[in-house]
Amino acid sequence: YPDVAITLPNICRAMDAAAAAGIPVVVVQHLMPSGAPVFARGSDTAALHPEIARRPHDLLVEKTMASALTGTSLGGWLRERGIDTLVVVGYMTHNCDDSTVRQAHHEGWKVELLHDATGSLPYRNAAGAATAEEIHRVFTVVMHSNFAAVASTEAWLAALAKGEALPVDNVFLSNQRAITA
């Protein structure tokens, strides 16, 4: 959730708009050793989606951990270029996106996440069960309370056209609005 029929076109729109605006585009690929249940190097689950693969990008990052900043050259590459803001799109909201958002925030970058250009999957395990929509909603609400400015692709495109950053929120106000609603 949201459906890939919504998220994939939004991911592509964001990539295209960033490239047109001269904003560096970084593609991140999660790769695991052969034999892994998902993302095994050379497998279909590790391949970039053709729509992503065909788009121009400034850097391709191969990672083995959830965060795109852990064990990769991405942080140094961003610092060398004086990049102060990361716009996060792609999958999965609750795993790679959340991990990257939090690490980037902790390391001092401003972070923006496009909620309709990211997505989650449903889970069931010993801790319980949650739908993809529940997971996506909870993670984006929490990210927006402290770690990232979370907005739609349309809102980001409008802010980009105006040369503005997305508005950020904070933990206190997010909580106060919830308890007074």
Name what the model sees in each region.
Residues 1-5, 128:
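Acidic/histidine-rich helix-loop elements
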Residues 5-8, 24-26:
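Charged, well-structured alpha/beta interaction segments
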Residues 9-16, 20-21, 38-181:
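Active-site-adjacent betaalpha module
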Residues 17-33:
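Von Willebrand factor
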